[in-house]
Amino acid sequence: ITALCCPHFYLQRRETVNILLSMLKKLPEYEALLSALEARQAVAVSGVSQIIRSHFISALIAESERPALIVCQDDLAAQRAQAELAAFLGSTPPLLPARELTLYESASVSREWEHRRMRLLYGLATGKVKVLVASMEALSLRTVPRQTLFGGLVTLKCGAEYDLDSLTARLVRAGYSRTSLVEGVGQFALRGGILDVFSPAHDQPIRAEFFGDELDAMGFFDPLTQRRTENLDEAVLLPVAETVPFLHPDGAEGLCKDLSTLVARQKRRKTPNTALISTLEGDIDKLQGGVPLTAADRYMALIYPEFSTAADYVSRDAAVFFCDHGNLRRASKARMEDFGLSLDSYLQSGTLAGELCEFYCTYDELAGRFRENGAIYFDSFLSAQFPEELPPKRILSVTAKQLPGYGGSLETAVQDLKHYVKNGFGCLVLCGGKRRGEILKGMLAEQSVDALLAFPATRLPQAGQILLADGSLPAGMEYPELKYAILTEGQLMTRTAPKKTARPKKATNRKKLDSFTDLTPGDLVVHEHHGIGRYVGMEQMKVDGAVKDYVKIAYQGSDA
């Protein structure tokens, strides 16, 4: 605990990270990638595993000092990339989450992921978010256009004048609900000249105190104690959802007119879809009666005529990195196919109108949005097919590998270290702190392996030398051309948990999964209680205050 609180601890770790990033400057492939970034060209790189890819991306971001977007196949891959980048960059880049479309009307809808997305979209648009990690699905989902977002937000500034009636009306149009006490995001309360509001742009609710029409004072407050915690000069009140009916070019009235046109068109058909007509007319009544439309996503194409995704918020100056290009294409195809399978039930049940079903862009369309940026495609193996809109101008190959863990076997690790030393490699072993380094140094000495403590690390190890330095990585790395090996304390000192005696299992003819990695989106699976469904992917959900990973299975006639 003392070490974690010491600024010197962070300085030592930062110096180790800087050494790791500078190591790549000795590779001609790295210099070629840096030149391609400066020229805004597309380049493909093969032979890079997960940790190697993150090493390259971190070094390129640090040296180019440009904003960056890292695109991964799904949320789990994005979370792994996020953790690796945090180890190299010293700070955790935000992750843009995917979200489920709300196409069925419901009494209450959780918009936690939408709030997080709205904050990040605004951060991208204003340049506050410099590095972003996103899954293919999160990036390709249709969303509020950038210009519309800025037109729908409210900015509060101390000293400025506001008409409270007009201000609260704007909040209602932005999707906020009026309550007596503000407890969650998307709520506001007005008591005399005091306005409490909880915007997705902030971690805490805001209390704005007015003297007449002038905003006299403003600050955050604790929703539990209702006490002010920090003063503010300016605050941004973002729309509370990605699809807000009032953000239609002609407001809610314009959306009602569009829905009425769809109803009239259906009634003129020989075989009108009565279920769809009922849905449309019911939503028109809600809009005209001022009732919140929780399933506004189904009218996204009407509310936002311009097809826009999170990619449109990314700066034209940003460096774009596509991770596992082949998997990205497969993930995009699986998402489109999965949604296509659900469309039949949406159309038959009258949930969606046939002309309003465009919610995702393809991988090729997404890549085409970055023509001005250029891009770098990272793959373990060379891919034969790249997006036509953004093909690589050059293909590079890197010789490097990710090192496996030793399963707690120090003897195996010692053999590898001796092999590296014998072959003239410089070995850098990352420890969790100086005390841990001293312990590891003693353990290696018992195995006749000489190692030097480097706290702080000011240089890379020389040929045949082992340095123990501060730092941590999810996995080790080997660069044969540079003759460097980077190992982690976790590889060397992990202890395996004692094995439990397996209970005898009943005989079954079912084929059970050894790992969920055996599944690919679109596979048919049999749930023990719910029957046959289609595997969609892994999804994180917050249950009882804890965030856990869950398997998502789609069934006919329902979302999941």
Set out the residue ranges of the language-model regions:
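ASCE RecA-like P-loop NTPase motor cores
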Residues: P7-A560
